[in-house]
Amino acid sequence: MTITGIIAEFNPFHNGHKYLLDQAEGLKIVAMSGNFMQRGEPAIVDKWTRAQMALENGADLVVELPFLVSVQAADFFGQGAVDILDRLGIDSLVFGTEEVRDYQKIADLYTEKGTEMEKFVENLPDSLSYPQKTQAMWKEFAGLDFSGNTPNHVLALAYAKAVAGRNIKLHPIQRQGAGYHSVNKDVDFASATALRQHQKDQDFLERFMPSVALFEQASKVIWEDYFPLLRYQILSNPDLTTIYQVNQEMAVRIKEAIKTAQSVEELVELVTTKRYTKARVRRLLTYILMQARENVLPEAIHVLGFTEKGRQHLKSLKGQVSLVSRIGKEPWDAMTQKADQIYQLGKPSIAEQNFGRVPIRIETN
């Protein structure tokens, strides 16, 4: 049987995600971000709600990406997620993309010339941002051009790099309907961005979300809910360079900007430069919010939920892969668990995220 991996945020889960799961074959394993997203923002609803949405709509097994995999630039996010899925035995990786290319060929190219390609990136001027350097590399070696508004295509290339040299086939699916950042309501498939923006529009949600009741019952948060706490973390820390990935230049800019910024968005605007993209700045602010430090990734994989089919697969992995299904006195990953505690501060109604929580079981698919 085919074992298909899907890397996702489901922020929130919508019909486009359901379409992706429907297109996937065999046993479907999702490696999903926890409570903080790749672009450096809190998830609109918590990881358990999003895992349940996925399991109700075609996923067989949902595992959690640790915080230091979830909140990373595309390459590191892709690498960390593929590492986890590879250990769970996938032989195919399905993903949505704005531009269906021969990603397998691109992965083979990276297998062959990876060292040379990375050297090329290292020699590019530091005035370029990391995404610009990566795009220059793909243009040079694979003749790829970028239109600028194709975040899924950029992630797909990160997945191609991550599967290079592994026995995993890439299976791109053409993204349906609205673009990633689109807030357009008049489409067949709405984007997660549009759903977050129109979260109070009942008819809109019902049109584009398969598990709308779960979404409506869940506590919802936005970055601004954490702004007072972020502000406190910045003001009370005498040396921001002790935080993961924060350099001297960024520390100075953030300290200066917090004097006048009245919101997270304003702070991001003030700190962003040509070299430091908004997404990168948001990630740095997320690290500051968590007081994140460089940390070893957990050996074990945290299981958020499964169907009967997923449970059977986990049983077959026993003894080969270290799995965590309940977090007790011993932490699974201290950094992720700290992030979850801070996530809970966003709204008093958010349920406990770890202790006593057991995987969600969905009996029928």
From Swiss-Prot:
It is an enzyme of class 6 (ligase). The keyword tRNA processing applies. It is found in: Cytoplasm. Signal peptide: none annotated. Its main location: cytoplasm. The keyword ATP-binding applies. GO terms for molecular function: ATP binding; ligase activity, forming carbon-nitrogen bonds; tRNA binding. ATP binds at residues 7-20, 96, 152, 175. It catalyses: cytidine(34) in elongator tRNA(Met) + acetate + ATP = N(4)-acetylcytidine(34) in elongator tRNA(Met) + AMP + diphosphate. This is tRNA(Met) cytidine acetate ligase. It comes from Streptococcus pneumoniae (strain Taiwan19F-14). The lineage of its organism: Bacteria, Bacillati, Bacillota, Bacilli, Lactobacillales. The gene is tmcAL.
